Structures are given as structure tokens and as C-alpha cells.
Design a protein with these regions (language model features):
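N-terminal auxiliary interaction/assembly segments of multi-subunit proteins
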Residues: 1-162
């Protein structure tokens, strides 16, 4: 069986963010999310049909808060408050969950096993032991800086587990 795992391109990520948020989004090559960012980052774990970890997404708190606020049509100040407090409000967390769920579409390709969102880990929650090593590893990954117009920017790191 051939490998059908793919990392989406930056254009696909930008288009998805723009379509979902209804505003201009700029993406550019970025550096990987750092270990020091992990405790306050939003992590999304994606699994295949066998419930095996397929990919992990790390969004720096700044990106998660700004995208969550834009999705909910909240003022930029709502995102800034969450960033200052190093946690997401329940409304922002719900919006970020929806964003992560929609991002699953970038991982599903024809002829490959179905990929689903398994879990979203918010700042302050316990992080599954196997998640961070995959997020930090070199290999098949996409590291971007994503900027949401009139809100702000942050790191977006997506790494395949295989």
C-alpha cells in the first residue's frame, strides 16, 4: 500500500482560514512552535480510523486567540485579554475547537484512511505524553506564521506522526 499521508500546502491553509474567518489572512513560512510555547499553546490531535495518532497541530496562543475571536466576530480586545491571561475564554475555546475540526479537511485525501479530530488540548490542560515529541520532531511538517487581518498573528505547526 502506498503512503497517502500528505502535509497541506500553505495556500490551502490560508484559503481555509480566510473562508472560515471571512477576512484576509496572510501566511508565510515560519519557525516551528517551540517547547517553551507548548504549555500555553492549543494542541489538536488527529487520529486515523484505527484511532492511531496521525498528526498533531500546535497553534501558539496568539494565533488561537486571534483566530477564535475573528471566527466569533469578537473584538480584537477579547483575544488580547486571553493572551494576557495565558488562557482561552470558553467562547474562544469553542471557536478554536471548530477551527481545528474544519482543519481536519486538509488532512483527508482521496484513497487514504479517514482522519478525524480526536482531541483539542487547551492551555493549562494535561498534554498527552505522545503528542509533544511528534510536534517537536523534524520530518513531515508545515510551519507557518499565520496573520489574521486586524487581529494578530502566531505560529501554526502541523506535524505528521508517521
Amino acid at each position: 500500500m502506498s503512503d497517502t499521508s500528505v502535509i497541506p500546502g500553505s495556500l490551502a491553509v490560508r484559503n481555509l482560514f480566510e473562508d472560515l474567518l471571512g477576512r484576509e489572512v496572510t501566511v508565510s513560512p515560519g519557525t516551528p512552535i517551540e517547547q517553551s510555547d507548548v504549555p500555553t499553546a492549543v494542541l489538536a490531535l488527529f487520529t486515523n480510523t484505527a484511532n492511531q495518532l496521525y498528526a498533531i497541530l500546535g497553534m501558539q496562543l496568539e494565533l488561537a486567540a486571534n483566530a477564535g475571536a475573528a471566527l466569533g466576530l469578537l473584538p480584537a480586545g477579547a483575544a488580547e485579554d486571553s493572551i494576557d491571561e495565558k488562557k482561552l475564554t470558553p467562547v474562544l475555546a469553542e471557536n478554536v475547537f471548530e477551527l481545528c475540526n474544519v482543519l481536519t479537511s486538509l488532512l483527508n485525501v482521496e484513497g487514504a484512511p479517514h482522519i478525524k479530530l480526536y482531541q483539542v488540548v487547551y492551555p493549562g490542560m494535561p498534554i498527552p505524553n505522545d503528542a509533544v515529541p511528534y510536534l517537536m520532531a523534524l520530518g513531515r511538517r508545515l510551519d507557518l506564521t499565520v496573520e489574521v487581518a486586524r487581529y494578530g498573528k502566531g505560529k501554526f505547526s502541523l506535524a505528521l506522526a508517521h
